[in-house]
Every structure is written in structure tokens, then in C-alpha cells.
Amino acid sequence: MAVPAASSIVSYGGAATSNFLTTPVTPFLAGFYNSNFVTDRINSCAPYRVDRIRKQLQDEEENGYPPADDRRRGALFCRSGTWLEMLPIENPDDGSTRVKVHGTKEESSKFSIVEFVSVAMSLVSIRGVETKNFICMDPSGKLYATPSSNYSTECVFLEEMMENYYNLYASCAYGDRFNPWYIELRRSGKPRRGPNSKKRRKASHFLVVHHDLDRLRSPVPNGNDVTDLVVASLFHQPPSHPLFRQQTVTKPPNPHRISNLRAKVEMTNQAEKQRLLEEKKRRREKKKRRREDRLRKEEQIREARRQELKSLREEELRRRYQQQQQQQASTQTRYNRPQNPANPYPTYRPLPTRSTVQSPRPAYNPYWQSPVTQAPHHNSHHHHHHHPRVSSSSDPQQRHQSQQHYLAQTVSNPNRQNVNYQRYP
């Protein structure tokens, strides 16, 4: 996507150090870049390339050698709405100057123009054109700027192109393949540390704006309107945004209160205006009268409620007074009752005894044995052995002695004392 502008030739998207591509990286190349072969080759060749680039830059600055032709210049626009800038700041105490890496809203800042130095396949370094400093990332993930004499592997970043033509720049020295440390700029312009960066966050997406300054007679830094070229990426608005809306489609006028008021203000007929004012005054008076009626009715309801509560309170007090009078009358009647002087104290009368007096329970007899119950003899049964017949005597004294045999038993205890024991009945 190459769009000519009035003041410069600008190309949007694509890789920073490679030739401009009109389409994103194919899946084959994406897999090739992520393969172990390419990764191992980059890790083995990057230190050597870094040393060679440092010597080349020193020769350019000290001996005046011409710069390399493969370097592209441009600017990095963050999707959060800021331009990557390397601003020199002078310290008033000692007079030293340091370069601050941050994001700026100024589109025409000359400190936002950078050049991309190719280190290896998909490895680039970002250098400010005005400050001659490289953007680096320290072990804590903080961005800083360093001169060409201190150029190291911390100044090398892995460039990755996404499907939406935005680029990601991850630190080559720190982080890993699964948790890379990206360059991120907040909406306020403050950079975020590498360990806290995310791939899918807008603050880590950068749009490469290339400037072919050699072809321009009067180069203007960032002399273009980015909003006219990549509206969808910069505004992050749905298709209902005015820049996406078709100009040929016009909506019918929708009358509402504001349009009615505007028509009343623009009215030139004084008689009509006076009529509208009188009608408005009548509506205001009617509204005021209705409000007064409503307040009057509410006051009447409140007064009726107060009278009802007052009558209920008086009735409750009257009822309590009557109860108190009744209690006093009953108490006076009890005190006025005559006493019996013949027998002022009641005589003591013992409790009536029970008619059936039970005898005390005998002591427990551990040697007591239950009487042997003889099996009944049935005349109808014929056994092989003969049971001795019990002589049935008609003497009641003899029958009583036979029954007393089972009530008491004579048992010899360890003390050799024959005592009659009885078990609990």
C-alpha cells in the first residue's frame, strides 16, 4: 500500500529493513522464521553482526565514511495514538544531556524520525536520526537510549509482522519465544516494561511510516495526515464512524424538541410569537394551579389523619383510666372483707394415710432359688413310666404347709448360720 502525499512519498506497513511488501508474510515464511534452524542461526550470528555494525558506525562518525544504502528512514506510530520519539533532555545541574524514549502526540517532531539497521534475518535495530542513539532494553525490561559506541545485543529487536500490517518489536537479548518482551507505549506516552507487555495489546502494535527522503527536494518530517490513510487502524471505530459512512446516503430530517425550539426562535411574526408566549404563560399558570390543588389535598389528608390519631389516643387513655379504677375498687373490697376472730389460725391436720399399707421390701437374697414347678400330669397321656399319685388330702392345715414350703428356704451360708432368706416378691 503506497500512497503518494503532497509533501513526501510515504509508504505504510511492511517490514522496516526489508523491501516493501504489499501483502503480509505468508504462512510458509512465518513458519520458516519461527523454525529452530533460523532461530539458532540468528542466535549464533547476532553477536558477530553486532560487533561489525558497531565498528561500521564508529567509522562513519569518526572517519566520515558514507552511511550504508540499505537503511530505511521513517517513523513508528503506536496503535495507542502516539509516535515513538527519542527526545534529548539537558540536565541543568551538570549540563549533561540524556535521551528519553517515550511517545509523543506531535506528528511533526523531528526527533520521531528513526532509521532501521538490519542485523540479521528479522532482526533490526532502531536508531534516532537526530540523536544518533539506539533504542535498547535493559534486563529489567526498561527502554533506554545509548550512543553508537555502546551498541550491543540489547539494542537488537526481533521484528514480526501481523496480519493487520502492524509490526511487533521484541527484545532479542531478553525474554523467550513463549514470553517475549515487546516495546510498548501507553496512551500517555510512557513506555511499559518488557515483562508486562502483551502481544495482543494495542500499545505494542506499531505502524511503520517510511520516508524516502532522498527523492524529496524539500523533506518535511512526518508531513502527512495519517488519519486520511489508515483510518480504521488509528481510530479503532466501528463502521458507523463518519469516515466510513457513505456520503451519498442522507437521513431524512427527524423533528424533535430542539428543532421545534429553533423554529420558534427564528420566527419573525410578532403576533404569532405573542400568541405562543401567552399560551406558554397559561400553561405555566395551569401547572402552578394544579400543584397548589395537589398540595391542598395532601394537607387535608394529613389533617384528617392527625384528628384520627388524636381520637384514638384519647380513647386509649380513657380505657386505661377505667382499668385502673376497677383495680383500685377490687383492692379496696379485699381489704374491707371481715376476718374470723374465733379461729384466726387454722389447726394442723396431718396428711391422710393410705388405706393399703405396704410392708417394707425384704433384703436381696443372692442364694435364693426359684421353686421347682412340677410338670402337670395329664390323664389322657400314657407314658411308659408311672408317676406316683399325690394323695389329695382334705386337711386345710396340711395344704397350707405345702404352700409355705415355696415361700422360704433354708440355705447354709459361709458363716454356717441357717437363715431363712426371701427374694424380692
UniProtKB/Swiss-Prot annotation:
InterPro entries: Fibroblast_GF_fam, IL1/FGF, Let-756-like_FGF. Residues 281-291, 378-389 have a biased composition (Basic residues). It is a peripheral membrane protein. GO terms for biological process: fibroblast growth factor receptor signaling pathway; negative regulation of cell projection organization; nematode larval development; neurogenesis; positive regulation of cell population proliferation; positive regulation of MAPK cascade; regulation of axon extension involved in axon guidance; regulation of cell migration. The keyword Membrane applies. One of its GO terms (cellular component) is nucleolus. Residues 277-298, 314-425 are annotated as: Disordered. Expressed in pharynx, CAN neuron and body wall muscles. It is found in: Nucleus; Membrane. Interacts with pal-1. Belongs to the heparin-binding growth factors family. This is Protein let-756. It comes from Caenorhabditis elegans. The lineage of its organism: Eukaryota, Metazoa, Ecdysozoa, Nematoda, Chromadorea.
